[in-house]
Structures are given as structure tokens and as C-alpha cells.
């Protein structure tokens, strides 16, 4: 053994060839600060070996290196800029020394090589991969950019266009694509990986492969003519500006850095990467996006822990076909759980099957599946008008009309047709689960399972625990949601649960602004362009359905009359009374017509102005700051109340539910991350300016206490150790 660290070791293989093996405790390898330091020590040992002829890098895990240790990021990003820059210089010196070894090097890459893992293998001369490879640089999705030389080496290896596509979008690619663009030199079966890598290494040692020529371009300026460079970088900057926008500075910074570094050799190019990385790491956007990643890991880990002792349902059923039922059936079947889809008429069943078939055909058109796979999936969806086969199902989700009487009747009837241990769930969006449970003989086997539309795209499923829902029931439903590829978050029961409970105060803020004379177009523009929502409240209401919102608004008002009961006729009432239900009937705040792709396109409609004039004061202008405050304060206050009342368990789960269920702007990180970034005292000052608008603007006492003591909702993060300590971690 030449060297042994906590996460990697170095040993001789044969005749002057050494292997450097990443083998961290646990299931995966991460390129954390300790591993970077250890890698530097191992390379120091190699540099002393006069008889070294070649080096093989490999992993003892199912994945090569999944990336940097993102749990370190928040503390690392609190280090002063100068110290962070010094540590990056140290880390890059390690990878430079790996690249500069006086012998050929190869990485045998299996599974994931992402972020720092990808940057590590870019420093070797050759890369041989297995078919399960996923390799790329996802840093821009975390609000940063590659910091271990990825923005320098990748463009010089692949050419500017391919590298920009991966780096700016934070993409990873599979084995075939990696081979095609030159990111790896070959792909072999897993059992042949080491044998194949050794064969390449021997050829390089023997002079049959020119490893020095392979290495040279990575250390020189990027080979691009002035015209080629202008075209590549101009197009890339335009595309990034269009897709990422001003709220995500990392992608455009990465492109500009690669452009600026193109004319320099390795050392100066790495300095430019360092100078760009450090300021990004100190942005609120980076902290928010890293926070989302960590919250996502927390939520998924919690679901995994919750379901460790239960079996994933093997057969499911959906009550109520149509678009929602068909979407749920498709998602279950697509992920391998056969499903019975029941309705009371053929027309709805046809609609449900058509929806599932449409989604599968899209996969076929994109080349994701072939005809055989399509037929196989669709054959596991069984439409029926009766309860045939319900005695074999493990779980049933009800997705009928949002009416408590209808839901109770359907659930009670279904309970008599299934086994004693079958779990029942309701896809209600607002009706309290404990109320629906009153119709059942076995309420302990019942809970809520709130999907979001469109089911195949929206990652969140709210799992609602009723008063009598058993732990086993919750675990089984969480297991099914996870199997379906969703992110399940368990919440306690109340009208609207979590997501809709906090959404409708936001809509109430919108209605009050309209009442006071604001223009709905300006509100949408401000909330989209300035705050960052994917769609403004008027457009969102049109997509959700004005009729759906009108009904849900009444349910919420009955559930929380002290805050959500209004004493005036609002814009939603006016549009509902005029049969303007949004996209579903082509008339809402806008008029909708199908575009060339069959998608609804919004157009101005003068008729809506007359309707809104009936429920609004004369038009007046509002500042962007006031619009944002009046929209967001009611929502954030309600989010805080949900935490204080135990409806949602943690700030992390609340923020993920908002991001995954409502599209809360990721660069804000969620309501609690936004609160912490803004500061609770500053938020309180802002909210108090609008408390005259009513109870929705009254800040909960718990948040007032936070403001008094200057306490954040997320645990405070301590800066990482001084840079000198990190080098020897």
C-alpha cells in the first residue's frame, strides 16, 4: 500500500502501474474538502515514485464520484472571498498535479461522475466508461459554476459548443452521448472496465498511444478562430439570457468566463474561473439553490425512512377517470405499478385512457420508448365500469368531483369492495380528510393524496394525515408516491392542507389589489419578471380554472373565516358569474385561442375590463415593491402559521412543497429561505405597513418573536474552517 486515506487509497497494480481508488465510508464517493486534501497527499506520493509508469483511477462504489459534498457548500460559501479563492487555488493545484504527472493516466468511470467527479476525470489523459455512465457539470443549477477546472478543460477537450451546452445548462449526459462528443474515449461492459482501462494504459506506456498529445490541448488556449468564437459565445449568451434570465446569474457568468479564458493557457484560465466562482458562491441565489438541493435530500430521506418497513403497493386503482385520473393511472403504470381505472361512464374512461395514451405517445415521439414499451405500459392500465379486480388492489386513490357528498359516497362504496387491509386515499385538493373519513368503517386505512396537475410533470404529492390515519397507511401511500417518481410530503389535516391553504391568501392579496385599482397585467408582470414566479396570479387563476378557484375559495373561507372570509365581491366572483372560467372555456382574465401546436395562447380581451370595473376602484398605479409586498405577505404569514400549528413539520418541507407544488421561484429557495434572507425584522417592518388591510396581513406571534430575537428559521451555518486547515482536512 503506497498511501491510505479515509476516502481513497493508492497501491501498485503491476509493473510500475499504480491504482488510485476512491473508497469513502458509506455508499457513495464525494469530492469533499477532506478528499481533495487526501488526493493531494496521494499525488505527492506518486510524484516520489521513480519507477511509476502509469496511473489508473477507479472507484470501489456503484458510482465513480457523485460530485462535491454539497452539505459543505453553505459553510464553505460563508468563508471570506479571499480565503475561498485560496482554497480553490489549492484544490486546482491538486488537479493540475494529477494532470501533470510524467506518466499516462486513465479514469475507469462507472455510474455517476458529476461536478467535482467530472472535473477530476477531466484531469486524466483517458476516460473509459460503463454503459450506466452519467457525466456532467451541474453546478449552474446550484447557482455557481465549475470551480475545479471544469470550465477550462471541458471546452478545450470538446470544443466550445458542446462544453457550453453542458456547463451553462448544468447538464449531464449518458455514455453514448459522452462518447460521441469526446468526453470519454470508450464504453465497455462493467465487467470489462478495469481490463479495458489497463489495455489502454499499456498502449500509452508502450508508445502506441500518444498520451502527451492527448493532454496538450487542455493546457493551451482554446482553438477557435475569431469568427467561430464570436458565433459560439454570442449564440450561447443569447440562449442563456433567454432561458435563465436575470435571476440566475451563474449560467451567463460561466459563459462569459469561458469566453474570456479562451485565449489563455491553463493557469491564467483557471485564475479567471476562480475569480468568477468566488462571487457567485456568495450570492443569495447560490445559498437558496444549494438549500433546495439539501432540502430535497432531506425530504427524500425522510420518505425513505418512513417506508423502510412497508412493502410498496403492487396493484393500484383509481376512482374517476378523466384528465386527472388518467394522469395518475399513467404515472403509476409508467413506473411499474399496474392500475385499475374505474368510472361510472364509458366517456370518462375513454378520456382517461386517451390521456394515458397521449402521454405515452409523447415519450414515443421523443425516442424515450419504443412501440413495445408503449404497448406494455398501456396494457397495465385496466379501465372498468365496475369493481372487478378491486379485491386484488393494495391501494385506491379517489379522484372524482370535488364534492364532499359525492366523495363520501364513492369512498364508502369502494370500502366494501376491497380487502380489509387495502388503503384508500382521496385526491381532494381542499376538503378536510377527517371529514371524508366519517363515511368509512376503517378510517385508519384512509388518508389524503393530493396530486398536482399535470400529474406527469408536477413532482409534489401532498400526503394528508387525517385524525385517524394510521402510520402504516401513511407509509404505504408515501411508498406508492415514491415509486411513482414523486416527492411525497406528509402534512396534517386542515382545509386546503398546506399548499392550497397558503395559495389562497396569495390570491386574496391579488383580489384586494384589483379591488383597490391595480391592473392585473402589471401585477402578473411584476410577480413574474421581478419576483420570479413562473406565471402571475391572473394567468395562474386562468390555468387553475376560475370556477375551481371560486369553489376552493368558498371552502377556505368556511375553514378560516377569521382571515379568509371576505366582505366584498371580488374579481374571481365577477369572472365566475360571467362564465369566464379560464383556459378551460377560452375566457378568463384573457381570451384564449389555440396556437399552431394546439396550446392555449392568451390574448387581450376588452370585455374583462368592464367586468372588473364593477368590483374595482378607479385604476391607479402601484409600485413594484407594494405589489410584491401585498401579494407575498398573506402567503408567507399563512406558511408560518402552518408551521406553528404543525400542519407542516419543518421549514425544509414547507419550502420544497412551495417550490415543487406551486413553482415558488427556486432562486428564492422557498418562503422560509426568503424570510431568512430578507431577515424577520425587515419582513415585520414591511408587513406592518399593510396590516390595515386586514387579518391576512397580521404577522403571526411566532414570527414576531423571531424578529425580536433576530432568529432565522433554518439553523445558523458556521463558516468552514480557515483555508490552511482545509488543505490538510
Swiss-Prot record:
GO terms classed as biological process: fatty acid beta-oxidation
Binding positions for NAD(+) per the UniProt entry: 324, 343, 400-402, 407, 429, 453
Disulfide bonds: none
Source organism superkingdom: Bacteria
Residue span of region 3-hydroxyacyl-CoA dehydrogenase: 311-729
UniProt keyword annotation of Oxidoreductase present: yes
Active site: 450 (for 3-hydroxyacyl-coa dehydrogenase activity)
Database matches in CDD domains: crotonase-like
Matching Pfam families: 3HCDH, 3HCDH_N, ECH_1
Keyword annotations from UniProtKB, A to Z: Fatty acid metabolism, Isomerase, Lipid degradation, Lipid metabolism, Lyase, Multifunctional enzyme, NAD, Oxidoreductase
EC number: 4.2.1.17, 5.1.2.3, 5.3.3.8, 1.1.1.35
Family according to the record: In the N-terminal section; belongs to the enoyl-CoA hydratase/isomerase family.
Database matches in NCBIfam families: FadB (TIGR02437), PRK11730.1 (NF008727)
PANTHER family with a match to the protein in the record: TRIFUNCTIONAL ENZYME SUBUNIT ALPHA, TRIFUNCTIONAL ENZYME SUBUNIT ALPHA, MITOCHONDRIAL
The protein's assembly and partners: Heterotetramer of two alpha chains (FadB) and two beta chains (FadA).
Protein name in the entry: Fatty acid oxidation complex subunit alpha
Organism: Shigella flexneri
Amino acid at each position: 500500500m503506497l498511501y491510505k486515506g479515509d476516502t481513497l487509497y493508492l497501491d501498485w497494480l503491476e509493473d510500475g502501474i499504480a491504482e488510485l481508488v476512491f473508497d469513502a465510508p458509506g455508499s457513495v464517493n464525494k469530492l469533499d474538502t477532506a478528499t481533495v486534501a487526501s488526493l493531494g497527499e496521494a499525488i505527492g506520493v506518486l510524484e516520489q515514485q521513480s519507477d511509476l509508469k502509469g496511473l489508473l483511477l477507479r472507484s470501489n462504489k456503484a458510482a465513480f464520484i457523485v460530485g462535491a459534498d454539497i452539505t459543505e457548500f453553505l459553510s464553505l460559501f460563508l468563508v471570506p472571498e479571499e480565503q475561498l479563492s485560496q482554497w480553490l487555488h489549492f484544490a486546482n493545484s491538486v488537479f493540475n498535479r494529477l494532470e501533470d504527472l510524467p506518466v499516462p493516466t486513465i479514469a475507469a468511470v462507472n455510474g455517476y461522475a458529476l461536478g467535482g467527479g467530472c472535473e477530476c476525470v477531466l484531469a486524466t489523459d483517458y476516460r473509459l466508461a460503463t454503459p450506466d455512465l452519467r457525466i456532467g457539470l451541474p453546478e449552474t443549477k446550484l447557482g455557481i459554476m465549475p470551480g475545479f477546472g471544469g470550465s477550462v478543460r471541458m471546452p478545450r477537450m470538446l470544443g466550445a459548443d458542446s462544453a457550453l451546452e453542458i456547463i451553462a445548462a448544468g447538464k449531464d449526459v449518458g455514455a453514448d452521448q459522452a462518447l460521441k462528443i469526446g468526453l470519454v474515449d470508450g464504453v465497455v461492459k462493467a465487467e470489462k472496465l478495469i481490463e479495458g482501462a489497463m489495455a489502454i494504459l499499456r498502449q500509452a506506456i508502450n508508445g502506441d498511444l500518444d498520451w502527451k498529445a492527448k493532454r496538450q490541448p487542455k493546457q493551451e488556449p482554446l482553438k477557435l478562430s475569431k469568427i467561430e468564437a464570436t458565433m459560439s459565445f454570442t449564440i450561447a449568451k443569447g440562449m442563456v439570457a433567454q432561458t435563465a434570465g436575470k435571476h440566475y446569474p451563474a449560467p451567463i457568468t460561466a459563459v462569459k468566463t469561458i469566453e474570456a479564458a479562451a485565449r489563455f493557457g491553463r493557469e491564467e484560465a483557471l485564475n479567471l474561473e476562480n475569480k468568477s466562482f468566488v462571487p457567485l458562491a456568495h450570492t443569495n441565489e447560490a445559498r437558496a439553490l444549494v438549500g433546495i438541493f439539501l432540502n430535497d435530500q432531506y425530504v427524500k430521506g425522510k420518505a425513505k425512512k418512513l417506508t423502510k418497513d412497508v412493502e410498496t403497493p403492487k396493484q393500484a386503482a383509481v376512482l374517476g377517470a378523466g384528465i386527472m385520473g388518467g394522469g395518475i393511472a399513467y404515472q403509476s403504470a409508467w413506473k411499474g405499478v399496474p392500475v385499475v381505472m374505474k368510472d361510472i361512464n364509458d366517456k370518462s374512461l375513454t378520456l382517461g385512457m386517451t390521456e394515458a395514451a397521449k402521454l405515452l405517445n409523447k415519450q414515443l415521439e421523443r425516442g424515450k420508448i419504443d412501440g413495445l414499451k408503449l404497448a406494455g405500459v398501456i396494457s397495465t392500465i385496466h379501465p372498468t365500469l365496475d369493481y372487478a379486480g378491486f379485491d386484488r388492489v393494495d391501494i385506491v386513490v379517489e379522484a372524482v368531483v370535488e364534492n364532499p357528498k359525492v366523495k363520501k359516497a364513492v369512498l364508502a362504496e369502494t370500502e366494501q369492495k376491497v380487502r380489509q387491509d387495502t388503503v384508500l386515499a382521496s385526491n381532494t385538493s381542499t376538503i378536510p380528510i377527517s371529514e371524508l373519513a366519517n363515511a368509512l368503517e376503517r378510517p385508519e386505512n384512509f388518508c389524503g393524496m393530493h396530486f398536482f396537475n399535470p400529474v406527469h410533470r408536477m413532482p409534489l404529492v401532498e400526503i394528508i394525515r387525517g385524525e385517524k390515519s394510521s402510520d402504516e397507511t401513511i407509509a404505504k401511500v408515501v411508498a406508492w408516491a415514491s415509486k411513482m417518481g414523486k416527492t411525497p410530503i406528509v402534512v396534517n389535516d386542515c382545509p386546503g392542507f398546506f399548499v392550497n391553504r397558503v395559495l389562497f391568501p396569495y390570491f386574496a392579496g391579488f383580489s384586494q389589489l384589483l379591488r383597490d385599482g391595480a391592473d392585473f397585467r402589471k401585477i402578473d408582470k411584476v410577480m413574474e419578471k421581478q419576483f420570479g414566479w413562473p406565471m402571475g396570479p391572473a394567468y395562474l387563476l386562468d390555468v387553475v380554472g376560475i370556477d375551481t378557484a371560486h369553489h376552493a375559495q368558498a371552502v377556505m373561507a368556511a375553514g378560516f373565516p377569521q382571515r379568509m372570509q371576505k366582505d366584498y365581491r371580488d374579481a374571481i366572483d365577477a369572472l365566475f358569474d360571467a362564465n369566464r372560467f379560464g383556459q378551460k372555456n377560452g375566457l378568463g382574465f384573457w381570451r384564449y385561442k389555440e396556437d399552431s401546436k394546439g396550446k392555449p395562447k392568451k390574448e387581450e380581451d376588452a370585455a374583462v375590463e368592464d367586468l372588473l370595473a364593477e368590483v374595482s376602484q378607479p385604476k391607479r398605479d402601484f409600485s413594484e415593491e407594494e405589489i410584491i409586498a401585498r401579494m407575498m405577505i398573506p402567503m408567507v404569514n399563512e406558511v408560518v402559521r402552518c408551521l406553528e400549528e404543525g400542519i407542516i413539520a419543518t421549514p425544509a418541507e414547507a419550502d420544497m412543497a412551495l417550490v415543487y407544488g406551486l413553482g415558488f421561484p427556486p432562486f428564492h429557495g422557498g418562503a422560509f429561505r426568503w424570510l431568512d434572507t430578507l431577515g424577520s425584522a425587515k419582513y415585520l417592518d414591511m408587513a406592518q405597513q399593510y396590516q390595515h388591510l386586514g387579518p391576512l396581513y397580521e404577522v403571526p406571534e411566532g414570527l414576531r418573536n423571531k424578529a425580536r430575537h433576530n432568529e432565522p428559521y433554518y439553523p445558523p451555518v458556521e463558516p468552514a474552517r480557515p483555508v490552511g486547515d482545509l488543505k490538510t482536512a
